[in-house]
Regions:
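Sec-dependent bacterial lipoprotein signal peptides
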Residues: 1-21
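Leu/Val/Ala/Ile-rich N-terminal alpha-helices, chiefly Sec-type signal peptides and the beginnings
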Residues: 23-105
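Generic alpha-helical secondary structure signal
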Residues: 54, 58, 68, 106, ...
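Amphipathic alpha-helical coiled-coil segments
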Residues: 63, 67-70, 74-77, 115-118, ...
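Extended, non-membrane alpha-helical segments enriched in charged/polar residues
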Residues: 65, 173, 177-180, 216, ...
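Secondary-structure edge/capping motif, primarily at the C-terminal ends of alpha-helices
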Residues: 74-99, 133-136, 179-193, 225-228, ...
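Extended amphipathic alpha-helical interaction segments
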Residues: 101-197
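Extracytoplasmic/luminal low-complexity segments enriched in Pro/Gly and acidic/polar residues
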Residues: 191-234
Length: 234
């Protein structure tokens, strides 16, 4: 019995070593697969994050949780934008003739309320992502491509969107102001397709003054939106 136990000991040691080696190989394979995936996503021009398949989740192991930080922020960001900025841009695009200032102003007022919350929602989502990001313990070969994708997915969209919010609100407020002015003129404002006529030179001057401020505000908004993936000025 003593002889048998001594003989089995090196066998058990060898088996344990083989198990550790297999585990090490598995982690290396997961790193390699995840790095290749990150590089593939980074090379895509549309900036979208693909949903992981069940096979990819298995191949990436715990790195699946690292990727979830990116997808969670992206979903929260897109949801916040689609509930505020996107509808506002749609309303702005429907203003084509002077009478449209009247028909769109109430919807624009509601959109401004949603836009005032957009900054809070995006900042909260970024804080959540940053907190999870700081806790990551990644090997260097994973960290380098992951940091690039984190910057593109989280940092850059946030930095581009936040300055665009006041630009969008200011532009919408100017459009509402024109609509309110036209409403106040009553039947003294006569709409004729792409033009509007007034009874007095003072009305014409005031209307022209309001409209004159729009091109610069519109250009500022367009410039701000260029840095936000998936958001385009209509």
């Amino acid at each position: 019995m003593t002889y048998r136990s001594r003989w089995l000991l090196p066998v058990l040691v060898i088996l344990a070593a083989l198990q550790l080696a297999a585990c090490g190989d598995s982690e290396a394979d997961q790193r390699k697969a995840f790095v290749a995936f990150l590089q593939s996503v980074q090379s895509q021009q549309d900036g979208k994050l693909p949903t992981l398949t069940e096979e990819q989740k298995k191949n990436f192991g715990n790195f699946t949780n690292d990727y979830a930080i990116l997808t969670t922020f992206s979903q929260q960001f897109n949801q916040a934008v689609s509930g505020s900025l996107t509808p506002m841009l749609g309303q702005i695009s429907r203003i084509r003739v002077p009478k449209d200032y009247l028909t769109q102003r109430d919807d624009l007022r509601q959109s401004i309320g949603a836009m005032n919350l957009l900054s809070q929602h995006v900042k909260a989502a970024k804080v959540q992502a940053d907190n999870a990001h700081r806790l990551l313990k990644q090997p260097e070969e994973v960290q380098i491509p992951y940091e690039r994708l984190y910057a593109r997915t989280v940092i850059q969209p946030t930095n581009a969107l936040l300055p665009a919010i006041p630009n969008a609100i200011a532009f919408a407020q100017s459009l509402i102001q024109i609509g309110d002015f036209l409403q106040a003129q009553g039947d003294q404002a006569v709409f004729n397709g792409s033009s509007v006529q007034f009874r007095t030179p003072q009305q014409v001057a005031q209307y022209n003054s309001l409209v004159a401020a729009l091109p610069l505000q519109q250009q500022n908004l367009m410039n701000a939106l260029r840095g936000i993936t998936g958001v385009n000025y209509p």
